[in-house]
Amino acid sequence: MAKITELDHHLNQEKEALDKVVSNLNELCEHNQKLQGFIEIQKEVKELKKEHIKSLSWFKKLINTVSNIKYVFVKSEEQLAKDAIEQNNKLLKRIDNTILSVADKSGPLKQELQKELRKNFENLAKKDLSKDQRERLSNLLNNEYAANPQKFAQLPMSKPLHFPNAEELENQHNDLKVIQQNVLNLLTENSNIEELKKIQKQVAEIREEVPFTKLEKLNNFWQKIKNIFVNNSEQVLAKNKENNTKTIINIEEKLHKANNKFFELVSNKKQDIENIISNLPDSKRLEAIKEKLQKHINVKDTNNIAEQASAAQLQSAETKPTAVVLPNNAIPTTPPVTEEKTFTPPPAPPPPMPTDNIPTPLPVSKAEATEHKNVETAASNVPPPPPPPMPTGNVPPPPPVGDNTVTSTPQKAKETNQPRPAVDTTNLMKQIQGGFNLKKIEYGEDGKPIPKNKEDTKETSDPIIAALNKIRSAKVSSDSERSNSDSGTDSGWASDVSTRSKKVLTRRERNAKQSQQR
C-alpha cells in the first residue's frame, strides 16, 4: 500500500509531462482517424484526459493505450504514406521519451512499466499478425533504447564512438533488435533440438548495451547455431527445412549489413572529428604538440629496442676477464701495447747456469787464507740477513753489491720499516720486455772460465739497477748499525764501539781448547 501511495505521489509530481503525453496521443488520433481501430483508441485518450489525479492505475491505462496505437500502426502500415509514417514515428518517439524519463526517476515505477509492456506484447502477439509484423511490434514495445536515444549520448564512450544526436546508433540498435528476435524465432521453431534450447536462453539474456558489443555477441551465438544446424541430420530438420533455410539466409544478410554499417559509421565519425580539429583556431599548435609527442614516442621505442638488442648480445657473448687497475708503483703482468698495436710476448727466463762453470778464486797467502777462513766460519754460524723486498711482477734480483761484509750479528727487523722510495716502472718494464743482459764468461784453453778482476768489472750504467743497489746497500748498513747498537758490550759511548770483529774459533779449535781446560 505504501508503495502504491509513493508511486501515486511521484506521478502527480510529473503531471505536466504526462499531460503532454496525452496531448500527443490526441494529435496521433486526429492524424490517423481513417485507420481501423483508432476510433476506440480516441475514446480511451479522452477518458485519460478527464482524470486530473494521476495514479498507478491511470499510468497502466496510458501504457495500454500507447501499445494499442503501436499495434494499429504495425497492422495498417501498408495503408499509410511514407510522410505519414515518418510523422507518426516522430510523435511516438516523443511519447516514449517522456514516459521513460518519468519512469527513470523511480525504480519501482520503471519495473511496473516493464511488466506492463511485456504483458501487452503477449496479448497483442496472439492476434492476427504475420511473422514480420510480430517482429516489428516486438521492436516497438520492448526496445527501450530505441525510444530513448539520449541514453546513448550519456554512455561513457571514446570520442570516435560518441554520437551526440544518437540517430545512427538508434537505427543500428533497431536493426540488431530485429536480428535478435529473428534468431529467437528460429530457435523456437526448432525447440526439439536440445543444444538450441540452451543457446536460446543465452540469446534472450543479451542485454541492451552499446551496439557493437551486442553485434559481437550475436555473431558469436550465430556461429554456434549454424554449426548445430550443419552437424544435425536432415531427418531432425526435415519438418522446418524450407523455413529454416530462408531464415538463416535472411539473418546472415542482416548481420553482414549491420556489421558493415557500424564500421562505416565509426570511420565517418573519425573523419568528422579530424575535420573539427583541423578547423579549430589552435589546430597548428595541436599538430605541433602531436608531432613532438610522436617523436618522443619513436625515440623511446628505438631506445627500448636498442637496449633489448644489447642485452641479448651480452647474454649470448662469452664472458671476458675484466682488466685489473694497478697502482702507479705496481708492475702490470701483461706487456704494454706497442705503437703498431702488436703484442710482444715476454722473453723466456735465462737457463740456469751449470755448477761446473763456477770461476775458481785467485791464489792467496797463508795469512789471508786464515783470516778468510775465520770470516767464513763466522758467517756460517750467523744466519744471513733478510733479502730486500722485491717489487711485484717477477723482476730478477739485482747483482750483488761489493764485498761489504758485516761481521756483527744481525737482529730481526722491527715491525715499522722505513718506507721504500717510489721506483719508476717504465724503464724497468722496458728492460723486462727487452730481456736480460747476462755477463759474458770467457773460457781458457783448459776449458775453465777465466776470472776477471774487480777493476775490470764495469759499473752498471742502468739507473734502475743502480737505484736498487743503493736501496739494498742502505738496508744492509741500517741493519748492521742496529745490531751494533743492540749488542751487550756496547756502553752507548762513541769510544766504546768495537771496530774489530771477534775471532771465531772452529769446531776443532774449540774441542782442543776444552780438552786443555780439563
From Swiss-Prot:
Role according to the record: Recruits and activates the Arp2/3 complex, which in turn leads to actin polymerization, promoting Rickettsia motility during infection.
State the protein's name: Arp2/3 complex-activating protein rickA
Instruction: Give the taxonomic lineage as stored in the record.
Output: Bacteria, Pseudomonadati, Pseudomonadota, Alphaproteobacteria, Rickettsiales
Feature: compositional bias, Basic and acidic residues: 439-461
Domain of life, per the record?
A: Bacteria
Its annotated compartments are: Cell surface
Record's subunit section: Homodimer.
* Region (Disordered) residue spans: 310-518
Cellular component GO terms, alphabetical: cell surface
Q: Keyword set for this entry?
A: Actin-binding
GO MF annotation terms: actin binding
Does this UniProt record's set of keywords contain 4Fe-4S?
Answer: no
Q: InterPro entries of this UniProt entry? A: WH2_dom
Ranges of residues in domain WH2: 424-441
Q: Where is the composition biased (Polar residues)?
A: 418-430, 488-498
**Main site of residence?**
other
Q: Where is the composition biased (Pro residues)?
A: 344-354, 382-401
Keyword Oxidoreductase in record: no
